[in-house]
């Protein structure tokens, strides 16, 4: 079973400032597949200046009217601004006072 804190920490480590890079999607695809999901990467032109990547993960089959779960997301983040303004580095996960 996945540990949500450890998974969150690994996701935070990715510098996924828009446009998000392929490495975070490769990581997520691996995680989803290990959990039994089917995955599909969706690439779009965005505004034409960069490629936008989204990921769809499906557990179960919607075609059989059985129970299923779909996860569709993008994983890019806004630029962090001046790193020196942060208490901790935005891409170095830190647990402080019980909070990640």
Can you describe what each PLM-predicted range is?
Residues 1-2:
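Basic/polar N-terminal segments that are highly enriched at the extreme N-terminus
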Residues 5-6, 26:
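Generic alpha-helical structural signal
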Residues 6-15:
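Generic N-terminal amphipathic, Lys/Arg-enriched alpha-helix
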Residues 14, 18, 99:
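Active-site oxyanion-binding pockets that recognize sulfate/phosphate
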Residues 15, 25, 40-41, 75-78, ...:
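Short secondary-structure boundary micro-motifs
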Residues 17-65, 91-92:
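A non-catalytic alpha/beta surface segment that caps or lines the substrate-entry region
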Residues 68-100:
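Active-site metal-coordination/substrate-binding segment of hydrolases
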């Amino acid at each position: 079973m996945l540990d949500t804190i450890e998974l969150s920490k690994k996701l935070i480590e990715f510098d996924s400032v828009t446009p998000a890079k392929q490495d975070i999607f490769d990581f997520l695809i691996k995680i989803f597949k290990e959990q039994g999901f089917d995955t599909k990467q969706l690439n779009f032109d965005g505004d034409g200046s960069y490629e936008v990547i989204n990921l769809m993960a499906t557990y179960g089959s919607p075609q059989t009217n059985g129970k299923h779960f779909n996860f569709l997301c993008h994983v890019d983040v806004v630029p962090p601004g001046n790193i020196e303004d942060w208490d901790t580095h935005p891409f170095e996960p830190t647990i402080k006072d019980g909070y990640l």
